[in-house]
């Protein structure tokens, strides 16, 4: 180990500066040896304490507080630690260094690396044990085999899971092949197993014997192979270093890169099997060369020519025929070669002189010297394949590729066929390359590896595969047509494009239908349209896109949509822009009968557009749109697959696909492109690049100082059609740069490695890296259409008129007619909001500041600069064109000075155009008539309330999405201001590495009023409490949640006694709680302090998401309420009672929502004042909407329903227009666990069931159905899903139903209890149900399976009554705490006579003695007079609907009796 230390002197104290420049660098695979080397080195210098933390940091200052002075021990410690920090960091490879970027001391680096690579997790240990089981000798040498095993033994020991010696020996022996059986038998015969060193030595000796035998039987027959010459000479290379057998082999400087042992000889055990091959000497089939009669003659002739000189067993050998020279530019595949060999020095991209004394031996026994060694790469259509340790032999006649080294170094497999071969990815099986044979040899199809060009130079040559990828994977005929007609530079014109695996995977199709007979004579005469729905929601919440295809030119426009209802607005915009541009009108519009197109009928008739539709269920009649869908989707998916980009980026890929499709020739236009047909000029292909490849935009203007990097690796996502630039996504900072100064690496695809290596911490940083400015203008309505303007001075003029160019008198531009979504159709900038007080998010250049690069030489460098290339901006809105387009004078002055920096679009992942669907804004009436709409008088029509889809614009999922909308920005600003005002945290430097730093994220919610109208936008900053560790980051947890029964009881009492009910909301309730633990949190996404970006938040107050936050808030609230006289209920800890004389106040707490009621308005008002003074409380006054429950008070009582929740659920499940049914569950057939076909994806089923469970608050009529379907959540079937949809259909007909708390109620407590004996045919467990009434008010109900199988219906009913009595006993305790006294004992009605008698006396004890004793407590209550059990007829048993599905008549009868009804009229 070449490491030394220099001694520095500071204040007469030595400080060691350790130089570790030659120490083996840490990678992801050698931590074990690296840590031993580094720790031993520092231990030798007595500095190991700085690594393991035993040498602690002294205090920074000493002396008194009044006169502190710097501690010299601290200065020495800090300087020594920094030197060690630098030395250790220098011994870490670049790929690992980001993992320790947050460490500030050497001990933190050491601990971080230990946690990553030596953490004894179950997965890590299991992985190592699995590798040991799979580690077989195979073709490995004994040295390699033993080294792999011992390394894993040591790693397990490092993780604290060592294997004992016997187990290690067993692992070594069991994975050896059959030829080592003698050694295995010898070791097994010993009483005590030998050491691993002894086993290794015996295996080496046996390996030498096997090599000697195999070398004696191998005949030097001419073959195209490079192998290791094997003789009877014993391999002595291992003797010299046998004591260091388990050292790191990377440090063995004496070994050469190609010094490896030969493939093991496997004897043929089946001697009776005839030899079917052809003799290599005489050419006769049926015997091998070893048994040929001409063998002796052949050997003598070979020996007479030139006797071979002695050589070592590891000497490289080339068994090739020295015939006519073969072109040195061609590579030949050789399955027997162990090393790559080349005679062309240009084939080595990285090389070094060879200083060894070994030569390559050829078939005639002569040797050829080795001049250099190096490496290169061979390109394929998906990724380059690397060739390492190539031997450069000038005098050899062929370039040989070792199949073994090719497969092992690149993770591929090679399949040989009689006339061709294929190279496939080993993991996915996807073909990477296909080649053919030539002169009976397997020749690599590419002559040599091509250097990767990082420049966007039109003169750079590319292969057919590269052009195929650049042009979006077109058909081979189209590809050849483009290359031929436009004279594109191709690296090897004679080599024709064969196939593309990405195309084969994504472009499978059916037989086409017949062609349409419609003929068009001009653009826009026929427009075909259709909507496509994506199964995957994009990052910007796009679910659909709509296309418009011009029949005459086949030109396509694409707009992404969030809702299908946006089609009408989109088409109107599309029609106005195109008709104004081309000075012609749309004649006929062809589509299917979708509702989004039906909504356009009136508009079509008003504007004279003929609307043709396809017959029902016949999409083939809209074949042009359907085929265009297939073309777009296949091309887009192929682009994503080729670049390994997640499918959530489909709008970008589809936009680029349409951009390329419009520029590719099509046979329908006689190999003319739609672009050329529409604009009369040829497209420009020079600036096309491979979608998703690595790119390097010029980013100098964004550097903070002159030493920053001028560029960063980004991902190419498309073409900006409003600027002369490309779209470049930087993955680490999640910024989308728009730049014209870009260099490309078209063989590298960053996404393929980025997502796999993204850690949770990096994901948090990625979300937090968003920068935002309140002055940044964002588009408010942006379809995916390009829109440059002809008048824009940044773009070239319109193309010269051409005889074949239609509309040549119209200055037509093209860019906006493409479907690159980047910033198409940007609307006018939103007015800048005034800056609020308080902290603001980190800023970004505004739109004016972030104009794209200089417009100099746009005709040369614009990727979309095809003469008519400015239609995109000319088709943009007038406000945008006038505001954002600079004047010619300004443009000239700006471009003549210095280029402006590239624009930044803020979004991780890249943003699509923001669509703001404001359903609350009606069109402005310009006529003079006075209307209700002008006066703001709007009365909704109730008969249409159920036909309106309430799935409005969805809430954003990330801070990046929310920052695009001013309303969400304001909500986020309010939340941050509240946190700052409450002094929730302090910004501090990061704590030590062993302290958990909790992440945080934003939660966005729309708050609605009881009528469904929008109340406000709410943004909540929550901590990622799931990262907290119990006992370290928190101790106890509790959430103040009032029981639903308590709510119904208190509301029933308040309604009956005409008390006011007030609703409160505590602002930032969890912030009121004080933390007793030290909790550190990362800075909020979008609001990172630009001066201290690496600091973290040390929480002083609780925050939503923390494990201890609910309990901290509850303790704070409870302590205060107790000080002002409230008493905390024992029955329900979230209920508080204040009583002063005859005045009483009840308070119900559900986290931060509070209900308060009482009989004394003065006391109630004083209580509200006290709460407002202590907490930030929002008083909603009278109860109207609480926890998603709509409360409507009428003179006769209070109606509770969940109408809004039901409608949202129906809209989310697309069931709002479903045909209603009268019962939630059919009585037959009965559902079973195994009925129907199992769902492949149960996610939807489970989500709907979970949503329905919340409806039980006001809907006892669906309790049984929901409970029954909940029992199948672990394995739902299609039949269960249909039953679930039946509940939704029932709710669609009864969304306004709920429970009615009637005024003038008698406060008597009674309940109905029932059981369905053995009703479940899967396990024969009974179902019990009950419903409890306080007077006429239903206050509690349940439908639940019993715990076990019962022997009779009486036992089932008896258990049900016992459970009901438990609930009633709790209710009685709660009523007592509320000050309510019952005038008579509670009553339970049961329809089973035996169970009724059993509750009163033990007459059936002999038949019921197996019942658990705890069920018999009901007898004590009955005998003491605290409870009565009364028999009731089955016809009057109201709990019957809670235990089984009923017929329509019976269900409707019971539903009305149990209290589920519509809201009574006022």
From Swiss-Prot:
Q: Where is the active site?
A: 334
Bias kind Polar residues: ranges: 255-270, 915-927
Q: Which GO terms describe its biological process?
A: DNA integration; DNA recombination; proteolysis
EC number per UniProt: 3.4.23.-, 2.7.7.49
Compositional bias, Pro residues, is annotated for 899-912
GO: which molecular function terms?
A: aspartic-type endopeptidase activity; endonuclease activity; nucleic acid binding; RNA-directed DNA polymerase activity; zinc ion binding
> What's its catalytic activity?
DNA(n) + a 2'-deoxyribonucleoside 5'-triphosphate = DNA(n+1) + diphosphate
Pfam families found in the cross-reference section = gag_pre-integrs (PF13976), Pol_BBD (PF22936), Retrotran_gag_2 (PF14223), rve (PF00665), RVT_2 (PF07727)
Task: List keywords of the entry alphabetically.
Answer: Aspartyl protease, DNA integration, DNA recombination, Endonuclease, Hydrolase, Magnesium, Metal-binding, Nuclease, Protease, Transferase, Zinc, Zinc-finger
Where along the chain is composition biased (Low complexity)?
Answer: 229-254, 796-827, 836-898
Q: Which ranges carry the Integrase catalytic domain? A: 519-682
* Region of interest: Disordered: 227-270, 772-927
- Residue ranges annotated for the Reverse transcriptase Ty1/copia-type domain, each copy included: 982-1225
From the record, what ranges are coiled-coil? none
Q: Where are the zinc fingers (CCHC-type)?
A: 278-294
Positions that bind Mg(2+): 530, 592
What protein does this entry describe?
Answer: Retrovirus-related Pol polyprotein from transposon RE1
* Taxonomic source organism: Arabidopsis thaliana (Mouse-ear cress)
């Amino acid at each position: 180990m070449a490491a030394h230390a220099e001694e520095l002197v500071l204040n007469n104290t030595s400080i060691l500066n350790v130089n570790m420049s030659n120490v083996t660098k840490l990678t992801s695979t050698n931590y074990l040896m690296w840590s031993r080397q580094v720790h031993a080195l520092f231990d030798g210098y007595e500095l190991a304490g700085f690594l393991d933390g035993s040498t602690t940091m002294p205090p920074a200052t000493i002396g008194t507080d009044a006169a502190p002075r710097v501690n010299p021990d601290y200065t020495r410690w800090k300087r020594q630690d920094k030197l060690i920090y630098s030395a250790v960091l220098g011994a870490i490879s670049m790929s690992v260094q980001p993992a320790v970027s947050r460490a500030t001391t050497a001990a933190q680096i050491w601990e971080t690396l230990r946690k990553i690579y030596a953490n004894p997790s179950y997965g890590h240990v299991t992985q190592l044990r699995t590798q040991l089981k799979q580690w077989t000798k195979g073709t490995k040498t004994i040295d390699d085999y033993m080294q792999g095993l011992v390394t894993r033994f040591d790693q397990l020991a490092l993780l604290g899971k060592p294997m004992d010696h016997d187990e290690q020996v067993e692992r070594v022996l069991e994975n050896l092949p059959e030829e080592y059986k003698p050694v295995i038998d010898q070791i097994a015969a010993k009483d005590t197993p030998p050491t691993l060193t002894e086993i290794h030595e015996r295996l080496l000796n046996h390996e030498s014997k096997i090599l000697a035998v195999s070398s004696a039987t191998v005949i030097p027959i001419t073959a195209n192979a490079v192998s290791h010459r094997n003789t009877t000479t014993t391999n002595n290379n291992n003797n010299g270093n046998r004591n260091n057998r388990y050292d790191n082999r990377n440090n063995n400087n004496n070994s050469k890169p190609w010094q490896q042992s030969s493939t093991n000889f496997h004897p043929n055990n089946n001697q009776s099997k005839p030899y079917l091959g052809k003799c290599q000497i005489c050419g006769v089939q049926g015997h091998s060369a070893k048994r040929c009669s001409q063998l002796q003659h052949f050997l003598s002739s070979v020996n007479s020519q030139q006797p071979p000189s002695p050589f070592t067993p590891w000497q490289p050998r080339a068994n090739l025929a020295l015939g006519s020279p073969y072109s040195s530019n061609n590579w030949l595949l050789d399955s027997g070669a162990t090393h790559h060999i080349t005679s062309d020095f240009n084939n080595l991209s990285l090389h070094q002189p060879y200083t060894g004394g070994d030569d390559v031996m050829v078939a005639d026994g002569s040797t050829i010297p080795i001049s250099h060694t190096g490496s290169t790469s061979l390109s394929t259509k998906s990724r380059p394949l690397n060739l390492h340790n190539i031997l450069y032999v000038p005098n050899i006649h062929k370039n040989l590729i070792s199949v073994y080294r090719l497969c092992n170094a690149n993770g591929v497999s090679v399949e040989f066929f009689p006339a061709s071969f294929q190279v496939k990815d080993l993991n996915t099986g996807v073909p990477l390359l296909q080649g053919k044979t030539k002169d009976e040899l397997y020749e690599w199809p590419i002559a040599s590896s091509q250097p990767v060009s990082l420049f966007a130079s039109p003169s750079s040559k590319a292969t057919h595969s590269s052009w195929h990828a650049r042009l979006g994977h077109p058909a081979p005929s189209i590809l050849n047509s483009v290359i031929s007609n436009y004279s594109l530079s191709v690296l090897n014109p004679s080599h024709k494009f064969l196939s593309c695996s990405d195309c084969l995977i994504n472009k499978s199709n059916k037989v086409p239908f017949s062609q349409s007979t419609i003929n068009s004579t001009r653009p826009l005469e026929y427009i075909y349209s259709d909507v496509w729905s994506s199964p995957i929601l994009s990052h910007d919440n796009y679910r659909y896109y709509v296309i418009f295809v011009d029949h005459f030119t086949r030109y396509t426009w694409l707009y992404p949509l969030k809702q299908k209802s946006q089609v009408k607005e989109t088409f109107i915009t599309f029609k106005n822009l195109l008709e104004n541009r081309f000075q012609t009108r749309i004649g006929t519009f062809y589509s299917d009968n979708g509702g989004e197109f039906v909504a356009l009928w009136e508009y079509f008739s008003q504007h004279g557009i003929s609307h043709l539709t396809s017959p029902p269920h016949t999409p083939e009649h809209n074949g042009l749109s359907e085929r265009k869908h297939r073309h777009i989707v296949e091309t887009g998916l192929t682009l994503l697959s080729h670049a390994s980009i997640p499918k959530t980026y489909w709008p970008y890929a589809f936009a680029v696909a349409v951009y390329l499709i419009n520029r590719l020739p099509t046979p329908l236009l006689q190999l003319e492109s739609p672009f050329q047909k529409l604009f009369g000029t040829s497209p420009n292909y020079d600036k096309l690049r491979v979608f998703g490849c690595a790119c390097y935009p010029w980013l100098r203007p964004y550097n903070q100082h002159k030493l920053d990097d001028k560029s960063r690796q980004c991902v190419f996502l498309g073409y900006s059609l409003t600027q002369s630039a490309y779209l470049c996504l930087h993955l680490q900072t999640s910024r989308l740069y728009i730049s014209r100064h870009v260099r490309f690496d078209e063989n590298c695809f960053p996404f393929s490695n980025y997502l796999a290596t993204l850690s949770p911490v990096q994901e948090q940083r990625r979300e937090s890296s968003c920068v935002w400015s309140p002055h940044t203008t964002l588009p408010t309505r942006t379809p995916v259409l390009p829109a440059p303007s002809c008048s824009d001075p940044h773009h070239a003029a319109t193309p010269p008129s051409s005889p074949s160019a239609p509309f040549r008198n119209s200055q037509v531009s093209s860019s906006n007619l493409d479907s690159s979504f980047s910033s198409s159709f940007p609307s006018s900038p939103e007015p800048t909001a005034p800056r609020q007080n308080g902290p603001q998010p980190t800023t970004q250049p505004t739109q004016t500041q972030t104009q794209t690069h200089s417009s100099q030489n746009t005709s040369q460098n614009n990727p979309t600069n095809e003469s008519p290339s400015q239609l995109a901006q000319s088709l943009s809105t007038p406000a945008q064109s006038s505001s954002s387009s600079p004047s010619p004078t300004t443009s000239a002055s700006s471009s003549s000075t210095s280029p402006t920096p590239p624009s930044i679009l803020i979004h991780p992942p890249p943003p699509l155009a923001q669509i703001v669907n404001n359903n609350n804004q009606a069109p402005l009436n310009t006529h003079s008539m006075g209307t209700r709409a002008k006066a703001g008088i709007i009365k909704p029509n109730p008969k249409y309330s159920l036909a309106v889809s309430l799935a409005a614009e969805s809430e954003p999922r990330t801070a990046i999405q929310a920052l695009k909308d001013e309303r969400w920005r304001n909500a986020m600003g309010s939340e941050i201001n509240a946190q700052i005002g409450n002094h929730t945290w302090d910004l501090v430097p990061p704590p030590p590495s062993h302290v958990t730093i909790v992440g945080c994220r934003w939660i966005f919610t729309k708050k609605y009023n009881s009528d469904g109208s929008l109340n406000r936008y709410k943004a909540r900053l929550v901590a990622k409490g799931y990262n907290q560790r119990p006992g370290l980051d928190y101790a106890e947890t509790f959430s103040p949640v009032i029981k639903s029964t308590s709510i119904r009881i208190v509301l029933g009492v308040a309604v009956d006694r005409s008390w006011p009910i007030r609703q409160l909301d505590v602002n930032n309730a969890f912030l009121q709680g004080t933390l007793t633990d030290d909790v550190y949190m990362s800075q909020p996404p979008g609001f990172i302090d630009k001066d201290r970006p690496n600091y973290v938040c040390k929480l002083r107050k609780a925050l939503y998401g923390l494990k201890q936050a609910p309990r901290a808030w509850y303790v704070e609230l409870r302590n205060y309420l107790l000080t002002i006289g409230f008493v905390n209920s024992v029955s329900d800890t979230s209920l508080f009672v204040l009583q002063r004389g005859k005045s009483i106040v009840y308070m119900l707490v559900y986290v931060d929502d509070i209900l308060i009621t009482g009989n004394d308005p003065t006391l109630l008002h004083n209580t509200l004042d006290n709460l407002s003074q202590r907490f930030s409380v929002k008083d909603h006054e009278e109860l109207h909407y609480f926890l998603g429950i709509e409360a409507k008070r009428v003179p006769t009582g209070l109606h509770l329903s969940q109408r809004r929740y039901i409608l949202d659920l129906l809209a989310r499940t697309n069931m709002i227009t479903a045909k209603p049914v009268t019962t939630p569950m059919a009585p037959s057939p009965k559902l079973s666990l195994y009925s129907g076909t199992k769902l492949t994806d149960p996610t939807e089923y489970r989500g709907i069931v979970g949503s329905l469970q919340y409806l039980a608050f006001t809907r006892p009529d669906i309790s049984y159905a929901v409970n029954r379907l909940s029992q199948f959540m672990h394995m739902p079937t299609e039949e269960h899903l249909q039953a679930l949809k039946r509940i939704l259909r029932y709710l669609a007909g009864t969304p306004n139903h709920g429970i009615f708390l009637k005024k003038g109620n008698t406060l008597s407590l009674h309940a109905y209890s029932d059981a369905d004996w053995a009703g479940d045919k899967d396990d024969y467990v009974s179902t019990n149900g009950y419903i409890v009434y306080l007077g006429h008010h239903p206050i509690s109900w349940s439908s639940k399976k019993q715990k076990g199988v019962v022997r009779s219906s009486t036992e089932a009913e008896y258990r049900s009554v016992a459970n009901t009595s438990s609930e009633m006993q709790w209710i009685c305790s709660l009523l007592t705490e509320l000050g309510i006294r019952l005038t008579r004992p509670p009553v339970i009605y049961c329809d089973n006579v035996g169970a009724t008698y059993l509750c009163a006396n033990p007459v059936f004890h002999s038949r019921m003695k197996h019942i658990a004793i705890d069920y018999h407590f009901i007898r004590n209550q009955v005998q003491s007079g605290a409870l009565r059990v009364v028999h009731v007829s089955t016809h009057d048993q109201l709990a019957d609907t809670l235990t089984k599905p009923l017929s329509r008549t019976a269900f409707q009868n019971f539903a009305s009796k149990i209290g589920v009804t519509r809201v009574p009229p006022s």
